[in-house]
Amino acid sequence: MQKDSLPTLSPAVPPYVMLGLTVAYTIFYCLLFVFVYVQLWLVLRYRHKRFSYQTVFLFLCLLWAALRALLFSFYFKNCVTANTLGPFCFWLLYCFPVCLQFFTLSLMNLYFAQVIFKAKSKYSPELQKYRLPLYLLFLSISLLFLLVNLTCALLVKINRANTETVVLVRVTVNDSLFVLCAVSLSLCLYRIAKMSLANIYLEAKGTSVCQVTLIGVTVVLLYSSRACYNLVVLALTKIKSINSFDYDWYNVSDQADLKSTLGDAGYVVFGVILFVWELLPTSLVVYFFRVRKPTLDRSASVIPGHMFSSRAYFFDNPRRYDSDDDLAWSIIPQNIQASFTSDSYDWSCRNNSFTAYTEAEESHLAPEELNPY
């Protein structure tokens, strides 16, 4: 009799809600994958440079969207498989996308630092010697992030005795790097907003300082807030007030390290976290580095051997910025540009006078000499 009086257990989230969320998440990531794939195809279509900041960004975002779409596709019928993956597959689907996001953040730092260096190199050429150390710095930071993430993920799956210690090390190292890169990106954006040459540099790409600042600040806030959340919540995991809200499964928001399976409510929150802290910033990066159709500007000033255009896009022209001197040709002071324009005018006048003289001489020739065939 007592058995019949016990309440019936029911899932925390109805099955149709779980299915609907899975379909929605998968569609979002698939749409982003298709959009990035089209952007990479347009790079070939418009004959842009195949290896540039733009193509590297897009390729990283393409790989990230593919891995996330593959992860959520497991939750249609293979929930158990998704929660009991092997060590490498677990790292590839759950952890490696976070590494890809850190790579994009590091690459954004490198890109905007290059903007500052190139703008300053017009008057301080000695700054170019810092290019190689800058590349090596961000490469070493990215490799450190990757190695720590991979090692800790494998240790969690292989040896669960020290899971909390391993996760603490991973979160401390990786999320600290996230915060440092976010601060560095903020400083770069602040310097760009204060530099007139950098403003011209960005406007030549077809964007504005306000747009760059808005996207950059949003990405910085999203990435840094996620990293700070991981650090704070992991430091407070022993406090009962947090566990009482049943949030202990994701005390690390990028990987469910401390719980082997995700419950129904945990799955919903996991998807929301990925949407806000991953899909949104990645979509902003893809939008910023989208491929534009190259346009011809008739207002460009032409001189023998060089062409200057106020709308020459930074990424879109395949023959621009192949060397360090290209920025100096695209961003020139007013007095130098005026002298180039006057020289171009004198050269064109002499060319026109020579053409007029030639036509006058030819007018004295006989008709059969003008058309010998």
From Swiss-Prot:
It is a multi-pass membrane protein. Its main location: membrane. Disruption phenotype: Knockout zebrafish are viable and fertile and display no obvious morphological defects as adults. However deficient zebrafish have abnormal microglial with expended lysosomes. They also display increased bone resorption. Keywords: Autophagy, Lysosome, Membrane, Transmembrane, Transmembrane helix. It is found in: Lysosome membrane. GO terms for biological process: autophagy; bone remodeling; negative regulation of bone resorption; negative regulation of osteoclast differentiation; positive regulation of protein localization to lysosome; positive regulation of TORC1 signaling; regulation of autophagy; regulation of GTPase activity. It comes from the Eukaryota. The chain crosses the membrane at residues 16-36, 56-76, 85-105, 136-156, 177-197, 214-234, 269-289. Residues 1-15, 77-84, 157-176, 235-268 are lumenal. InterPro entries: GPR137. Residues 37-55, 106-135, 198-213, 290-373 are cytoplasmic. GO terms for cellular component: lysosomal membrane. PANTHER family: INTEGRAL MEMBRANE PROTEIN GPR137 (PTHR15146), INTEGRAL MEMBRANE PROTEIN GPR137B (PTHR15146:SF0). Lysosomal integral membrane protein that regulates the localization and activity of mTORC1, a signaling complex promoting cell growth in response to growth factors, energy levels, and amino acids. Interacts with Rag GTPases and increases the lysosomial localization and activity of Rag GTPases and thereby regulates mTORC1 translocation and activity in lysosome. Also acts as a negative regulator of osteoclast activity. May be involved in interleukin-4-induced M2 macrophage polarization. Also acts as a negative regulator of osteoclast activity. May be involved in interleukin-4-induced M2 macrophage polarization. Belongs to the GPR137 family. This is G protein-coupled receptor 137Ba. It comes from Danio rerio (Zebrafish).
